[in-house]
Swiss-Prot record:
InterPro entries: Kinesin-like_fam (IPR027640), Kinesin_motor_CS (IPR019821), Kinesin_motor_dom (IPR001752), Kinesin_motor_dom_sf (IPR036961), P-loop_NTPase (IPR027417)
Compositionally biased residues, Polar residues: 683-697, 835-851, 950-959
Function per UniProt: Plus end-directed microtubule-dependent motor protein that regulates the length of motile cilia by mediating depolymerization of microtubules at ciliary tips.
Disruption outcome: Mice show growth retardation, higher mortality (4 weeks after birth) and display hydrocephalus as well as female infertility. Female infertility is probably caused by fallopian tube obstruction. Phenotypes are due to abnormally elongated cilia that cannot generate proper fluid flow.
KW Coiled coil (keyword) present: yes
Name of protein: Kinesin-like protein KIF19
Similarity remark: Belongs to the TRAFAC class myosin-kinesin ATPase superfamily. Kinesin family.
Coiled coil segments of this chain: 361-388, 506-551
Residue ranges annotated for the Kinesin motor domain, each copy included: 11-346
Amino acid sequence: MKDSGDSKDQQLMVALRVRPISVAELEEGATLIAHKMDEQMVVLMDPMEDPDDILRAHRSREKSYLFDVAFDFTATQEMVYQATTKSLIEGVISGYNATVFAYGPTGCGKTYTMLGTDHEPGIYVRTLNDLFRAIEETSNDMEYEVSMSYLEIYNEMIRDLLNPALGYLELREDSKGVIQVAGITEVSTINAKEIMQLLMKGNRQRTQEPTAANQTSSRSHAVLQVAVRQRSRVKNILQEVRQGRLFMIDLAGSERASQTQNRGQRMKEGAHINRSLLALGNCINALSDKGSNKYINYRDSKLTRLLKDSLGGNSRTVMIAHISPASTAFEESRNTLTYAGRAKNIRTRVKQNLLNVSYHIAQYTSIIADLRGEIQRLKCKIDQQAGRGQARGKLDRGDIRHIQAEVQLHSGQEGPAEMGQLREQLISAFHEQMDVRRRLLELENQAMEVQIDTSRHLLTIAGWEHEKSRRALKWREERRKESYTKEDSEKDSDTGDEPDNLEPPEVASARENIAALVGEQKKLRKEKLALEQRCRELRARGRRLEETLPRRIGSEEQREVLSLLCRVHELEVENTEMQSHALLRDSALRHRREAVRRLEQHRSLCDEIIQGQRQIIDDYNLEVPRHLEELYEVYLRELEEGSLERATIMDRVASRALQDSSLPKITPAGATLTPDSDLESVKTLSSEAQRPQNNTLPPLGTDSESYHVFKASPRAWQVKSSSVPTPPPIQVGSLVTQEAPPQDSLGSQINSSPESSENLSEILLSHKERKEILTRTKCISVKAAQRRSRALGTEGRHLLAPATERSSLSLHSLSEADDARPPGQLACKRPPSPTLQHAISEDNLSSSTGEGPSRAVGPRGDGTGSWVRGQKKCLSKKREESLEAKRRKRRSRSFEVTGQGLSRPKTHLLGPRPSEGLSDRRMPACGRPSPGVRHLGKVSLPLAKVKFPPNQNTGSGNPSPLLVAPNQAGVSRRATRGPSLPHGSSTFGKDGRLQHN
């Protein structure tokens, strides 16, 4: 056995780590004096330096130090390990010695750097992990033997931490001058987990005691030694064995008795610690002197004897110095930096520990036996492979056809099995994904029910709070009135008791239920997040299988089966999504029915109040203000026409239709709705669909489908991309006055709104369909025409005017009429509805025949009192004179359109309405009669010219309203459509008026 290896000089690496300042130091008033300037330089400030010493009479002790690497309090354990120790592992495996030790005063973080914590492991754990990882990477070519020993030097006595029962051990020196510990336990293992367990066991045996300077002060020096032996797996007469050793040392900190306040055993321990560290400092001083050949006394301490090779022998050494940045530890920090700076000058001679083993001739026989055993093992392996080949048919090896047959047989046996396995994996992934989606659907339903219950309880509590505040206000008002009637009002107001506001049991129960429901909501939300994550994982798994299967499939039948499997899964996913949407719409429908029910209850209550108050007024002949009487007429007209009842009935029909169908009818793109389609039900569903809602299920990914076997079907994309036009909401409970413009017809609304012309072009009705609708509702038209004829008959004289005067009714004249109204009128603003009326609603039909809720109402029956008619006639005459005078002053230059083509203004005022009929609110329409109007009877109603306000833009649509002629005989008038204007023919002139191009 021969020791050989080339040697080379290696400089000792010194790193500095500055720990964070502690809370105790801050409480003492300490300041930061250690500052890291860059990656290598650290400056130590003098805390006693006088800033007013301009002449520098006192010498400053401020000094900068330069090291190989410096760390401040922001450095992590990983950064320290990567910069100092990681590079030593490769050398240890190759046969070099290495040493890492932490140096510094007590309480500066040496043990934290070497051992660390469970969350931030130190150099010990990180080094052993990387060491065994490097061994595993090269274990195929090399054989390794790893042994570990762990000891501590306590009061200059060596104790085995892995086996404390051995007592105190002694140091010995072998024939080569290497220091050994007699009787130390060395544990050999290749398992990293076992090494970690031994390390944890040794750390628990180490001596630690609290002092005034450090609550977890290490009272001993801990030395962890790891020995690695490496040899080649190839047997030969010459064998190379590399032996490397790694020392990791956690030194105890130097301490002052005045700071630690030690007594008794602690003081004795501190004395031994300082003695060994002093010997280490002397060795460093002696080794750092370059020009002198001083004797280096390693025998002053057992610590220096163990570190003999590490400091001046065969080892790559890293010293990590630790200091405190506090000004109270200035002297200790300066001494540590001084010794660390001197240690930089130490150079070691590093050589590889390589053992060349030459075997004796007598050992050749064992080597030959090992080689013969290896040959026999290889022969047996060859025979086994040949036997399997002969058992498959003893085919002729030279015939290419037999070889091809064998290959096909082999692939045929493996192909179906592999294909079946992949198919089973795909099906299982689909089933799991569907189960997760169904569970998500159930969770969504539960969350919806919890939300409904929570809203109900919150309404109960809110109602009680409102009632309580109302009672308190009423009680205070009564007490105030009572106090005014008494002489000692202040005394009475102070001695009153508050009303008893005990919560009802249902309110207390609601509060308790809300707390439980909130907890249930949180639980459901967590489960939903977990299921969504699981669903994403399953979709990714299924996508990977879909990518893999096409490459494994060879036949068209298998491809077809795979596509059918994917199709079935997609249909199941679509079914689940539709069920989710149906649940959401059922919930919305329940909310809507509840709101309608409450509105009906409120309306019935208001009707009772109005009738009762009206009865009191009639019984006692009370004087009623004019605007209140007009509002009452509006109320009577609503009751007579039954618009609210019709709206309620239509809502019930739509709700019943939605209840009967579990899923909405999705209209494909490009389809035209029939007149018989239930537009109201479609309106409800589409309006709910347009609201932003949370996804009930994770959406199918929109990834690229170029590699998928089965892509999304056209029907699936059609369902996803189709949009159902939204009909207008039915107007319920709104007051319509005389000054309100007429309702737009279906055709005018479609052509007057840019949005409706783009989105609702599919629902235009043909002439035949409109005629059929008008025929079915003939009775309604007859009734409307009769009322209109009576109104025109009473004021027919105003419709015939001199032909020489050319003026028409404009919105300006309407605004002038508004100016003539008396003050005190009720303002009622109502935004226009940009959507369509129902195709068969009575409001729309009455609008098309020239009679609607916005028209003048003739004399009512017995509902109106006779005592207000004289006032109305007087008001009508004054109004007529005012309008006639203003009409002569202004000449209308408006664009001639029919009255039914008017768009609704954005705002209008609810003012007093006279009762004479149409002539009271319209000026005489003079001029040439329109050729599109038929004359029925003696009185003819020419088309009125209407001027649009500047802020009312009818868009680029084509207004083609229904033209209606007055009917004196009470016969239902026939609706005809006027000539259609070209698209975009309406423009604004320079004067701000809409003109025809």
